[in-house]
Amino acid sequence: MRGIFSFILVFYTLVVSGQDNSIPLSIRVPISSRLIWHTYARGVQVYVCTQDPKDSSNFIWTFKEPRADLYADSSYHQLVGRHYFDASRNPTWETTDGSKVSATKVQQANAPDSAAIPWLLLHATGTGGTGTLTPAIFIQRIRTNGGKVPAKGGRPNKGQSIEVAYTAEYFFYSEK
């Protein structure tokens, strides 16, 4: 009986809050938000080997940009957009309907998989076009796989770029 009550309580909490409890509190959207789009990303995180600003004898891999295709399903069959940095180096998502949104990071949380890039909460800084993403205010990146920066660069790697494959799910929210 106790197990059934616990299940009902968890289910009720999910329905009422509208948010997945596996998402850390630090990257949850405000309760006043409404989900407008969910997409699956497959692409790369690009890193470049640079001199460590804290230790000039050391070289590190520095994040340069994301490049990913966005799909309607988790099998990556129907291409619906792309993800990249805009000219101002803001993460941007653009759909095949011509709408796009750029954002800045608000908060991050470690992914459950230590080899995966962090989960993020981002806030829109601008939108373009008319369509799916026009009303977007918040973006979540969750369920990441891969994409993590390599351990350490080295002098022979200075200036070189590497691409690390990743997948993620992106959720876009507007105000209710």
Segments (PLM) and residue ranges:
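Primary mode marks residue(s) on the alpha4-beta5-alpha5 output face of response regulator receiver
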Residues: 19-45, 53-176
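Sec-dependent signal peptide recognition
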Residues: 2-8
